[in-house]
Amino acid sequence: PPADVAAAGFKSIICFSGNREGMSEEEGIKNCAKGLKQIVPIAYKHGVKIVMELLNSKVNHEDYMCDNSIWGVKLCDAVGADEFKLLYDIYHMQIMEGDVIATIRKNQDYYSHYHTGGVPGRHEIDKTQELYYPAIMEAIVETGYTGYVAQEFIPAGPDPLTSLKQGVHICDV
């Protein structure tokens, strides 16, 4: 519950849309917005933001509803509350839609958190994958974002701590 999240000192909680299960995008937005409109005021009362994660439905989360930026933005507009935002997972959105930097710039007001991960494979964000994270981080900084960027990858190297340190270094712009 939001009260527990606030008591623990956290300012946001991540939520998920669930799967399509045959629903149209419009019906999914309507259903999610209906539920979120009940939750968001409670979270707001406790100073907590609700953040829905954008995930890919091609590789990792088959049938997931909130699998593209446009759908997420429409949901934010339907909820109509500053206390509800999106988590832009760079790994997932590269798989689903590409055009990462332009999408971040275009929808910056809807994003309140970011996750990293190398594509393909969700490994380190180094030269072994297709994204150039220094440019992505510069774009995020240019939007005025001052929050955290979470390193959310599965280390392929022998030392996970070294991989994490490298990821932090790559993102330190």
Feature names for model-found ranges:
Residues 1-85, 95:
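Active-site acidic/histidine proton-transfer and metal-coordination neighborhood
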Residues 49, 66-88, 92-173:
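Histidine-acidic metal/acid-base catalytic patches
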